Amino acid sequence: MTSPLNLTPTDWLARLSRQHDVELPRLKALNDEYELRSARSYMHPEIFREIGDRLQQVVIAWAQLVVDSVEERLDPEGFRLPDQDSGDDDLWRVWQENDADENSQLGRIDALVMRRSFVCVGTNEADADTPLITFESPLEMYADIDPRNRQVRAALRRWVDPQASPSLPSAPQMITGGGGVKYATLYLPNSTHWFENGIEQDRDEHMVGTVMVAPLVNRSRLTDWLGRSELETVLPLVHAANKIATDMMVAAEFVALPIRGLMGLSPSDFEDSAGNKLTAIQAMLGRFVAIPDDDGTGKTFEFSSANLDNFHQTINQLARLVASIAGLPPHYLGLTTENPPSADSIRSAEMRLVKRAERKQVPFGGAYEQTMRLVKRLQDGDWDPRYRRLETIWRDPSTPTIVQKADAAVKLYNLPKPIVPLRQTREDLGYTDAQIARMQTEDTKAAAEDPLTQIANQLSARPGSLSGAAA
């Protein structure tokens, strides 16, 4: 039970809207960093005045790399109770019918980038046995956490339909800025309310006693249950790398080509053999004719082109710092050596990344388990105490691909003394109970058709065969 506040739904709407508005600027900034829309950093104003719109910042996608490298190793494969040999097929059915296989990936990315995301559960009028599961962005949703038990006390989702025309007076406390109709969904322990332009339009009195929202929080702390972004620690280095890469392109524009000068000549003297004036780019590339002055003493000189190695070395050093902070293998950031790495060295380099993924499975799995407990509550009409121990089944993050997973499972089974039986191997490969049952039927059929098995069966069925052989 959460600590109740004596607030009306309208009061909750205003309270959560204000709290959400405070965080929105930072959440949008983090989202822009992931989408490679970051602002220019460490750039001198004189460069902007000199180059103007010709300067396009070079953006290195390290922010996406840091997030995606972890998320690619987070794959839920089912839910089960500790005393069950296999996963709960019905919960997995609800998960898949809500397209949670695809949408949960989006929720994990948002949580890693913007500190948290949310999973919402609701009643399904079309099919009461399949409650609705949706994944929501922190840009649209906010939850109030009870400081006593750290459970969700209320949650609010706000969004705007820019294509619709407002038919009711607007409510500035809901969403600031933008045109169109402003909608909101308010989640309370015993009811869900829908608002349009600040006026309640409908409600669902589900009487569950718990807010039907499970926060997916990344890197929460004891005093900060709203989480932190995976990008917080690497953004200064990413900005520095973007600045160095941009400086390198500016240097390539102005000083990467040799600069040639001529003494005793004016710009009008640059002509080709036909008497045509040379363009600036032709002169810069050296395709010009040197014309001496009246006394024939025209002289040419040349400045050597700039060496860009210092930019390369700086970017490589920043890449090493990002790899060490984010726990990424060096080859993820393009850092290689002359000697190709061995398979063992690659696995060793990925150990910290694997451990980071395993750490993420604990809080993210807890949110998914709470989601499925809410699903079970809507299905049965009451709480099942057994589901307090529900577990999320995750794919092994050290074998993120199907090929790696199959190789590991088959090796465990093909040992001289197998560590796991055949059924467990098939479960590790991700086959469902129905698929495993069909495989076992085919195994039995194949064994019955085996010639040696048929001969053995005939001998064992022949009357007195053993006694005759003994005689």
Feature names for model-found ranges:
Residues E102-R115, V119-C120, V250-E253, N307-V403:
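C-terminal amphipathic alpha-helical
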Residues I259-R260, P267, E350-E369, V375, ...:
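Long, compositionally biased
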Residues F118-E230:
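Extended, regular secondary-structure scaffolds
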